[in-house]
Amino acid sequence: MHEMSLCEGILQILEEEARRQMFSRVRTVRLEVGELAGVELDAMYFGFDVVCRDTLADGARLEIVQRPGQAFCLGCGERVAVRRRFDACPDCGSYQLQVIGGDELRIKDLEVD
């Protein structure tokens, strides 16, 4: 379950930003998670709750905005939607796809005190 280590990394960022921006409590964390990022959302919610116990983010709400996967097809030159890595191009059937979106994991914004 790599989601736990992802949550630990998020907490580290929160702690660094709290020192830098002088806030003491995190109320909400909004993440953007790409459909191709390989993140299990239920595990992410669980891991976030566990990792944040007894920290500045204890009880914080995690909101996840999922971004669709996108790729550029080298076969037909089209930008296409993909749900999984290594899918074929839905337009021409080629497997020569270059992912151009939907593989990100980033903190979009925070609500803090």
Curated annotation (Swiss-Prot):
GO terms for molecular function: nickel cation binding; zinc ion binding. Zn(2+) binds at C73, C76, C89, C92. InterPro entries: HypA/HybF. GO terms for biological process: protein maturation; protein modification process. Gene3D superfamilies: 3.30.2320.80. HAMAP family: HypA_HybF (MF_00213). Involved in the maturation of [NiFe] hydrogenases. Required for nickel insertion into the metal center of the hydrogenase. This is Hydrogenase maturation factor HypA. It comes from Alkalilimnicola ehrlichii (strain ATCC BAA-1101 / DSM 17681 / MLHE-1). The gene is hypA.
